[in-house]
Amino acid sequence: MIHIPYSLNATTLKLPSLIPQLEQEIPADAAGISYGKAEDKMGWNAQPTRMVTFDNVRVPVANRLGVEGQGFAIAMEGLDGGRINIATCSIGTAQQALEEATAYVQERRQFNSAIADFQATQFKLADMLTELVAARQMVRLAASKLDNKDSQATTYCAMAKRFATDVGFNVCNDALQLFGGYGYIKEYPMERHVRDTRVHQILEGTNEIMRVIIARSMLRQ
């Protein structure tokens, strides 16, 4: 297993070893390495996505991650942290969307009143904030368990990822709704928040898989 943390624009591919001193680089255009087309994605357009293909690429032993045949296990070890990361991305984006929506509803007027004065708007804002705070606390709990190598860390990371990414998308979607038709126009940030958070429910394991992990942990106890 090798790891490539650099984009296509880089001149080298860094292939880290488990021993930092052995970290080396190979040319990004080394024989056998090829790149697919830039994918035209729904969201996350600030981050280019391409397939990287290896065809009989020679990789020095010093650049190998761990023992041969252990690639899958090494990859799985990184998933818990990745799930915390994507959950945090959802919370941050949703927080921004909520702040923008809160400001907007105090400015937008209908029927001679700011729409923030309507009880329906207030209930929506209250629910958005409550769920966002709950999601943030769940992610913090899962991160703490991961840092402390708790035996249930994987389960808590799955719960945090599932909950926070669902909440994040829902908050952004509700924020777009509060903007009305303006929320659907690219001049305003809401449509991007919705597009970007949608993939969070898929990355690092779909939220359906998170439910499988959680349920299996419950049934083992």
Feature map (PLM): residue ranges:
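C-terminal helix-coil-helix/basic helical segment that borders enzyme active sites and/or dimer interfaces
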Residues: T102, Q106-S113, L129-F163, L176-F179
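Hydrophobic alpha-helical segments of membrane proteins
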Residues: V167-A175
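Active-site oxyanion-binding pockets that recognize sulfate/phosphate
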Residues: E77-N85, I115-F118, Q122, D150-K161
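FAD-binding core of flavoproteins
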Residues: M1-E99, A103, S113, E208-V212, ...
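Glycine-rich phosphate/cofactor-binding loops in nucleotide/flavin-utilizing enzymes
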Residues: M76-E77, V171, F179-Q221
